[in-house]
């Protein structure tokens, strides 16, 4: 918006600029993005804003007498994809496909389709899929399109697409089948997930670890532990599959849900032996399962073991272990690990402290929560909506209403940037506080603010109407707000009016 306004002002004040063509504008953008010693990749990576054109940079590069090879363009596009710069990544592959001198691989077609979904949506991706020139490339591109259907929970489209792929003979691996099972699990169609397994067996499509994990979860939903154990035994006998921590954790979770604690603990110990020092994911997955068993020792053991994995321990890792310790009731250790994170963090992520802040407030430790909040501010932490929600709810619970109202105002100021909504109980508690203490003006401002945010309810309006009656004030504007909010009047409201 600001850029458009700037160009509009320049156009009005300097007529010579209005005579410049679109081509000269593109050239000026390209020149600002490129210096004499830049290579093609550096020039494109400098395009920070999506509106700027990677296509223009490539074309300018080629027009200047340089070459752009398939391998170089491929590398740049994949790097941009990893950085979530989808528009520029798509522009590169689109330009590449239009060049007769450059060949698109099957993987290029698949990635381009994936990028089309991210930038333009499924409809355009479907159109592109039908234009892919050969079966090898279609085979590669079918998975990202199917994944798009799964992500959108588009069951009918996914099923129709699978029928089409089957007719073309393109279902030769477990991956499309796994996508369908994920879709059926997400939409609670567990019997259909089992039908996918039957189809795989009928067509002799080999299963992988994910296939078995999804199969076990579907069986758990339909027929319980015994059928899950049968699937697990079949997996053990499958020479093409190695049972790892993920399958064992799936089995352990089934046991936990079934109340078979001893079996769950035995399987979790077996899963721990499958962990490696290559990746931390398994450690934290098992840690959460131990937490569900209220097994503090298991949480500690996995936390310490995870430190043997190379690389920096992330904020997400710290959030996981602190959350687990809070859930098993060990706030002392949770605080110790929080302080460990704080001593090593590069950027102060308020989400980490929010976990401990929430634990303090839920346990009635208001002074500890207030002290932690002040400490995070001193350290440069920036409160988010969750911070204010935690403080607001804690202060309402402890009767510190002035502080709660202040936190509410700060939380409301953030509503335009997020989808957070305070609970109706908290809003009603604040309204009742205003009513009890005769704070008529404050109550009016509060309910109007809640109305503008679309959060008003019948109990809130009742409270404000009672105050209007007590103060002998007209309530026409309140009734108008109720009408806009489509609040139906009950007998109590009618009596007040």
Which positions does each model-derived feature cover?
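Residue-level detector of the short coil/turn that links helix A to helix B
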Residues: 84, 120, 153, 188, ...
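N-terminal targeting peptides
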Residues: 1-146, 151-160, 164-175, 188-192, ...
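Inter-helix linker motif
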Residues: 65, 100-101, 134-136, 153, ...
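Residue at a conserved register position within TPR or TPR-like alpha-solenoid repeats
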Residues: 77-80, 116, 149, 184, ...
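C-terminal structural cap/anchor segments
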Residues: 361, 367-436, 446-449
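Pentatricopeptide repeat
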Residues: 37, 69, 73, 89, ...
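C-terminal interaction modules of eukaryotic adaptor/scaffold proteins
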Residues: 436-497
């Amino acid at each position: 918006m600001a850029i458009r306004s700037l160009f509009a002002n320049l156009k009005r004040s300097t007529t010579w600029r209005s005579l410049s063509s679109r081509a000269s504008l593109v050239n000026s953008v390209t020149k600002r993005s490129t210096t004499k010693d830049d290579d093609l990749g550096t020039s494109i990576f400098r395009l920070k804003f999506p509106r700027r054109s990677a296509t223009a940079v490539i074309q300018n590069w080629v027009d200047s007498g340089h070459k752009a090879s398939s391998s170089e363009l491929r590398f740049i596009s994949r790097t941009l994809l990893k950085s979530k710069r989808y528009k520029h990544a798509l522009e590169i592959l689109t330009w590449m496909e239009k060049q007769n001198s450059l060949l698109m691989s099957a993987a290029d077609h698949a990635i381009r389709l994936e990028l089309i979904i991210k930038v333009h949506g499924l409809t355009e991706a479907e159109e592109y899929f039908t234009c892919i020139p050969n079966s090898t490339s279609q085979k590669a591109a079918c998975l990202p399109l199917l994944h798009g259907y799964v992500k959108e929970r588009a069951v009918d489209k996914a099923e129709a697409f699978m029928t089409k792929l089957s007719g073309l003979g393109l279902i030769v691996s477990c991956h499309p089948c796994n996508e369908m099972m994920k879709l059926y699990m997400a939409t609670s169609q567990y019997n259909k997930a089992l039908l996918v397994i039957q189809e795989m067996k009928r067509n002799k499509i080999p299963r992988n670890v994910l296939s078995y994990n999804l199969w076990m979860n579907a069986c758990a939903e339909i027929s319980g532990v015994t059928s899950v154990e049968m699937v697990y035994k079949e997996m053990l006998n499958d020479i093409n599959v190695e049972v790892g921590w993920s399958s064992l954790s799936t089995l352990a979770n089934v046991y936990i849900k079934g109340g078979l604690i001893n079996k769950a603990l035995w399987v979790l110990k077996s899963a721990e032996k499958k962990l490696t020092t290559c990746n931390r994911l398994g450690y934290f997955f098992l840690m959460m399962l131990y937490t569900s068993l209220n097994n503090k020792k298991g949480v500690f053991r996995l936390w310490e073991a995870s430190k043997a994995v190379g690389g920096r321990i992330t904020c997400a890792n710290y959030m996981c272990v602190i959350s687990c310790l809070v859930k098993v009731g060990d706030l002392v250790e949770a605080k110790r690990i929080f302080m460990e994170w704080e001593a090593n963090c590069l950027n102060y992520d308020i989400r980490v402290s929010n976990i401990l802040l929430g634990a303090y407030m839920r346990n009635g430790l208001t002074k500890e929560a207030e002290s932690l909040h002040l400490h995070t501010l001193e350290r440069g932490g920036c409160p988010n909506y969750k911070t204010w929600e935690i403080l607001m709810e804690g202060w309402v619970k402890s009767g510190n209403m002035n502080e709660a109202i202040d936190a509410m105002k700060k939380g409301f100021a953030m509503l335009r940037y997020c989808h957070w909504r305070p609970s109706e109980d908290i809003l009603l508690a604040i309204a009742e506080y205003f009513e009890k203490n005769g704070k008529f003006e404050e109550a009016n401002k509060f309910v109007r603010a809640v109305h503008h945010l679309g959060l008003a309810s019948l109990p809130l309006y009742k409270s404000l109407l009672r105050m209007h009656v007590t103060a002998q004030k007209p309530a026409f504007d309140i009734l108008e707000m109720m009408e806009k909010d489509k609040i139906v009047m009950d007998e109590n409201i009618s009596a007040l009016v």
